[in-house]
């Protein structure tokens, strides 16, 4: 549910190559774009590229790409640690430090350390002054810690700034469900699906709400749709598990 590189890529590119003399030349800018573009699809090659580039003066930009490559290679803990160090040592604007910390927090979430993620994202939020994306990410960390009221607070604040994102409504619906506020959960999930009718996370959550209301046919329909939309993702995995659990309970 977390997009590691969302929102920040343009800001990061501009900041690296307007703020740091060691990476100010055009060839470094091209290396950064190449390295970051390679990281999601071939993280091992991107990491090797970043390491070699850093030895030739790539500086903080090369270090950033190395950390991102570690994340995409499944080494989220190492990525998070390097991103935290980078955010601490880099000479940059507060907003840019916040972007790097936000990526570190998302990496901690992927690693499964919700406590560290919540702390890191809280620090990022101080720099980013309540930017909605950071609040949505921190809400997920808080929910993982069982702090559903805190998650609702973050999501409500995020929605008050930008009410156009289906995921914020879907996540808040889930938090409301855990707080046993099912009416609010249903209202949020319908809002999410108005914004994005094929949002897998929202359909997954609506299916859960249907199951709680004993409407098993509707629940199954939503979960089967999730499997069509996201067969190999986390939403698909959870939809499959819910169908299997429901079938076992029926039998």
Q: Which residues does each predicted region cover?
A:
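N-terminal leader/linker segments that initiate helical-solenoid repeat arrays
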Residues: 21-81, 251
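Residue-level recognition of tetratricopeptide repeat
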Residues: 35-36, 68, 106, 140, ...
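Register position in tetratricopeptide repeats
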Residues: 40, 72-73, 106, 110, ...
